[in-house]
Every structure is written in C-alpha cells, then in structure tokens.
Amino acid sequence: MPTKFILYFTPDFEAYAIKEVEGALGSARKLADFGGGTALIETDRERKDLLFLLSKARLILAKHISPIDVEFGVCGQGDKDLISILDHVLSVSYVLKGDRFSIQCRRRGTGSDYTSKDVEVFVGSWFEGNGSIPVFSSTGVVSGPEIKVVGIYLFNNVCYVGFSESGELINEHNDEYRLYAKAGKVSRSQFKLIEALRKFKITMHGGRVLDLGAAPGGWSNVLLGLGMEVTAVDPAALDPVVAASPNLVHLASISEIPPDGKFDLIVDDMNIDAESSAMMLVGLSRLLGNGSNAIITLKLKKGSNPFKAVNSAIHILWQSYDVVSVASLFHNRLEVTLLLAKKG
C-alpha cells in the first residue's frame, strides 16, 4: 500500500532531494508542492519500512521527513480544529506517562484564526497533563531516551499528522532557536552551528576551538557560551560583545595562526566555494589532534549540481579527515554541513 510523507528541502535543490529519496526508497512521486521547501511525496514502500530505510540512507539534501499516518479536513476555526487535531493525534500516537515527547507543527496557507504554535501548545499541554515530559531545544538534550515525535502539518484546509520516534528521523527536533539561548543572538548564522551541534550530538565543555570565517561572531558567541577558548579568524570586525570576551583571540588572517597551535575543534563557515574551503581545512588539519572533530559548511552555487560539488569537496577532505556525517540542516540554505574527524 502506498505511503505518504512530507519532505523538507532547500527550494533550489527540490529535484535533487526527491531524487535521493527515490534512490533510498525505490520510488518517490511528488503529489503536491506546499511551497517553502516542503512537498507531499508518495512511495510504494510500506509505512513500517519508510523511516527505517531513510534513517539508514546517507541523505544529503533531504532536511527532514515527516510521515503521514492520518489526514483530515480543517475549517480554520481554532475552537473546532484544535480539538479535532488532538483527537486525530491521539488516534495514531503512542505516548505514555513518563515518555519524553516533542510536538512539531508547521502550516502553509491562510484563513485560520490560530497559529502553529497554538497547535503545539494545545496538543503538548494534553500530553504533559497526563504525565509525559515535553522536550524543548532549550534543554540542550542531545542524547538519552528516545523522544516520541508528533508531526503536524497544516496546508490550507487539510491537516496531516504523523507519529514516530526520534531515532527514526533525519532531524528529530526543530526548535533550535531556543537551544543554548544563554549565548544571546549575534547573527542568524549562529543557529546553524547550534543545530549542527545537536544534529551531530557534539557536547563541548571547555577546550580550544578555531573559528574560520568568524565575523560577525555568531559561531564564536555560541562556542564561548559553551566555555571554550576561541581563536576567531576573519579580516572583518566582530560584534563588540564577542570581541570583548577574555576567552577570545581575533586574528585577521590564517597566516597569523601560530604554527604550533593545537585545537580540540575547528569550525569553518567561510563564504568561499566548497573546494577552496575543503583545501583550506586540509591544510589546517595539523592543528587538530587525531580523532578530533571539524565542522565545515560547504557553500553551493544556485543552479549547480549539489551532489557533484559536495563529492568533489569530500574527495579533497579525505586526504586528512574521515567524513562522519553530511547533512542539510534546517538553517542551511545553499549549503550543506559536514562533521569530520581527523585521521590518524
């Protein structure tokens, strides 16, 4: 029996994202384009096989998959729709007292007197009131027991609901804006690093980090908030609050990095082409201890073949690094993010 799901992707890479999902499942047909980098997809695979196959595939451009267990009509009136949505959620979900859970609602279209946040609060309050434990990004959870995930998608007058567990999903939790909130906002790009740390399950508490392409300082700000000593490299100025930190050293160029410097982590968000960024990171691998990690954002060009660009950069990185993971994060636009480990 065919199975439907919602696919999330960068709009410019829609065709490539659907193609890689088709490769993982054997079939994938677009039934509707919801806009904003989301589409309704149908596959010949059974529901029980869908998430297992996708979670095992090394997907690059698919940001998130939300399974659909039930779909039904809504009228746009909160006093009627919220109760109906909760009833349908309860019909397909399995969240017990003491279970950790996350409610994720997105909507496209107009004509409703309630928001996606209203839906999350209404449904989540019911589960919390019955003894289940809500999980928000502000808790900084990156490991532990599985999270029961309820996905709700509203498109005009139709609501789609799906239930899954976090280990089955490409991206288990989407509320990154509140993760590490204590760091404060310097630039939107810092949410990209926050999401990467969660996605790759990296916990850093102290240590030395090299931040390449640091200005205006969003990534450095997050890393400082984790208690790290940051060497920020960028010819441009940093945000005054970040620059004033006693745990930060600002260098104008890579040539100023001490040749005998050692770091526990390198992060690279430089706005240069993917191959150049990869070559830069290979040249700096001597600054990392064996097994230490690097996080790099590969910039892709609009209208180009993203698979070709990513594979070319990975071929260069293999000289010095093992590629642990490749992901298109929610906060990636024309780019993908890689987790690397220094060889040796």
Please report, for each region that a protein language model flagged, where it lies by residue.
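SAM-dependent transferase fold signal centered on methyltransferase-like domains
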Residues: 1-344
